Amino acid sequence: GQATDAQTAAFAMGLHITGETPEQVAVLAATMLEFANLVPAIPGISAVVDVVGTGGDGSHSVNISTMAAVVVAACGVTVIKHGNRAFSSSTGSADLLEALGLDLDLSADQVAAVARIAGIAFCFAPNHHPAMRFAAPARTQLGIPSVFNILGPLTNPALANAALVGCAHIPLAPVMARVLASRGVRALVVRGTDGLDEISLSAPTQVWDATSGEVVQIRLDPADFGIIGFRTEHLLGASPERNADLTRKVFGGTDPGADSEVVASIRLAVALNAAAALAAADSVDDPNACSIPLSDRINTHLPR
């Protein structure tokens, strides 16, 4: 807390201008984790998954990663999602969950207990990285993606060992993948060529696959999953309340009414991204899974 907001912003912009390196980001992430309120390990759980994005893609889409996390947990894989309020997007994961009525103010022990019982829990970043409150004003005032956007996905307080990570700023995607690989996290870092920090359904997606421990860059196409002519505008979100309403409709069993087409599109996006997160989790217990083409690994988890 000794740096002024101007100094913090200047530090972030300096890194942004020169280009963040994996070594720099790894040191920043390690320092954050050193001072974090870590979530205790859950006995008997081998894979803990995070489904998270950097935000800042400018799409103002619904919270696909948060909904995908619910699907992953429903498939029997433990999820401990790390997230925050919106800084450079309309609605952050914390904003959505709060609008849905969830209590964000949980201790690290409570997060572990919820994950053990429910199979899914949420780490609200300020509760686990209290020092980051000093960076929040500068980050908000900057209003553009910076190193702070990528530090969140790299500093899951539960030390998740598998992840699907969306990265809106393409130069930072390989940096994130290398940092995660160096820590042994089986991760897929993704960025749609349309700018989405998700696996896109309307354009090819660049993937930095770190599930083998090495980083391999590949490309996924919507046609790989039988998706043609998808309309991205159906993924547009708005306020936390609107996104919460759409989330209820995505998981509800009732007729979504006027939102039927939108909800169907969101469900498809959620299913695809959840399948990718499950593919990342597969490699925790089965390293040989990485020898299978990624599109095939994802397809095995898609409903037919």
Residues covered by each model-derived region:
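Short glycine/serine/threonine-rich phosphate/pyrophosphate-binding segments
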Residues: 57-69, 82, 88-91, 132, ...
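Active-site-proximal loop->helix
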Residues: 86-102
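Short beta-strand segments at enzyme active-site cores
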Residues: 7-10, 79-82, 189-190
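Residue-level signature of catalytic and energy-coupling elements of molecular machines
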Residues: 11, 56, 97, 152
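Active-site cofactor/substrate anionic-group-binding motifs, chiefly glycine-
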Residues: 19-83
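Glycine-rich anion-binding loops and their surrounding alpha/beta cores
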Residues: 34-37, 61, 76, 98-105, ...
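N-terminal glycine-rich anion-binding loops that anchor highly charged ligand groups
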Residues: 1-26, 33-43, 269, 275
